[in-house]
């Protein structure tokens, strides 16, 4: 009799994805982030579901319903802070996962990479809409500022913004639709993640050396299940440390003030994980130019595979490209810092310099370094 694990139509899919999956024997801890993202997504959906049971998406009661969750609902405070800080952890894992893909040349799996970019956009949209829901000062003003950017689109901009708002300003209609979208998008993300995995399993995983590992595969279970569980325990420990010791560390104090359309906060800024893109947006004095730069800062990932000039896949044996990669990481950290600073000297100049460097590294310097390394290997 055949093992049910291998014959049952449903269990067979799980078996081929997580148990008998042939995996390269040399993949490092950088390959843990895929499973961590899956856990983050499940955690966010579950905590979000319980929050939605007590939340009301009405401008008059949204803020007080969040306060009610934290004060009166059994363990409501821990659910709320796990959801808020879980989002931060989600983005840390996302950035590391995408960074791993860039470093080791995983972007040569074009379908997987492009679905990944689509996932990044969807997660960013979900997080943005979730930030609006508590209806604090920063929720309201960030929603106003970010949605207003669409008015820079020629001809249809103003109509588009009013259509998204459901009126002439961010109000009850906006909050209600943002809640609806924030609820549905994680399920769309789950479907996209399944497609992401489907395309990945068509080709098999990449590995640090960038060389085909077909001759040296090991089963996913028990080797990588154990490895993933270790990563998961570390992540949960970080999350719970954050939630139980300093839950508001990554939040904004302004969001503890109920939304007031008549009072603008001195510094409007999004959550920390959007600051790099926000800094790029602010570094261009022209509105349309800033919006284009903002969109391109993420969409540029789609052309990374087309700019690959090296004869080697990953950067493991490419010291020049490694230097550029870590310069890019440092540049993104600089942009994140600048995004949280006021618009004044010297932050404006630093932001503009960091923005130019960001695009230069990806579009110009990395392809050049690949070509130089090819030449060096010939000599």
Curated annotation (Swiss-Prot):
It is a multi-pass membrane protein. Its cofactor is heme b. Keywords: Electron transport, Heme, Iron, Membrane, Metal-binding, Mitochondrion, Mitochondrion inner membrane, Respiratory chain, Transmembrane, Transmembrane helix, Transport, Ubiquinone. One of its GO terms (cellular component) is mitochondrial inner membrane. Heme b b562 binds at residues 83, 182. A ubiquinone binds at residue 201. InterPro entries: Cyt_b/b6_C, Cyt_b/b6_C_sf, Cyt_b/b6_N, Cytb/b6-like_sf, Cytochrome_b, Cytochrome_b_C_euk/bac, Cytochrome_b_N_euk/bac, Di-haem_cyt_TM. Disulfide bonds: none annotated. GO terms for biological process: mitochondrial electron transport, ubiquinol to cytochrome c. PROSITE patterns: CYTB_CTER, CYTB_NTER. Heme b b566 binds at residues 97, 196. The chain crosses the membrane at residues 33-53, 77-98, 113-133, 178-198, 226-246, 288-308, 320-340, 347-367. It is found in: Mitochondrion inner membrane. Pfam families: Cytochrom_B_C, Cytochrome_B. Binds 2 heme b groups non-covalently. GO terms for molecular function: metal ion binding; ubiquinol-cytochrome-c reductase activity. Component of the ubiquinol-cytochrome c reductase complex (complex III or cytochrome b-c1 complex) that is part of the mitochondrial respiratory chain. The b-c1 complex mediates electron transfer from ubiquinol to cytochrome c. Contributes to the generation of a proton gradient across the mitochondrial membrane that is then used for ATP synthesis. The cytochrome bc1 complex contains 11 subunits: 3 respiratory subunits (MT-CYB, CYC1 and UQCRFS1), 2 core proteins (UQCRC1 and UQCRC2) and 6 low-molecular weight proteins (UQCRH/QCR6, UQCRB/QCR7, UQCRQ/QCR8, UQCR10/QCR9, UQCR11/QCR10 and a cleavage product of UQCRFS1). This cytochrome bc1 complex then forms a dimer. Heme 1 (or BL or b562) is low-potential and absorbs at about 562 nm, and heme 2 (or BH or b566) is high-potential and absorbs at about 566 nm. Belongs to the cytochrome b family. This is Cytochrome b.
